[in-house]
Amino acid sequence: MQHSDTLITHVDHRRLRSLLDQDSPTEQENVAALRQRLRGARVVSPSRIPRNVVTMNSQVVLRNLDSGDRMTCTLAYPSEARASRRHVAVTRPLGTAMLGKRVGQIIRWPGGARERRLRIQSVPYQPEAAGAMNL
């Protein structure tokens, strides 16, 4: 079954499938969720992905719906994720929740003792919109 609200470029889909096929022990707790996200996503050409969709290496502004706090982060591959640069690995629960979602959508992910609810406020940088189709 496809999740109509999840769009992924064929480049991201291929790279993420390859990453999951490596069966690395890192981030194992969320691998099943990421596999499910990939299975249900609608896969499109990088040139056809809307500018408001979170793709790999996108910079994303999120608003916490409970506290009102805003945070900016970049969705990254695990090997490229650096906390000091506010990168979120796609293999982490927040990263998987953001992947393929659009501006305005609410994402939910486990955070501490309770579920967190974040709204995607904007995508200031998306590689595909910037012409970087293979990032």
Predicted regions and their residues:
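Weak global preference for isoleucine
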Residues: I8, I49, I106-I107, I120
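Generic detector of short, locally flexible boundary/turn motifs and exposed helical patches
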Residues: Q22-E29, R37-G40, M71-L75, R82-H87, ...
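Intrinsic-disorder/low-complexity coil detector
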Residues: S24, I49, W109, V123-Q126
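Short peripheral tails and domain-boundary helices/loops at the edges of structured domains
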Residues: V123-L135
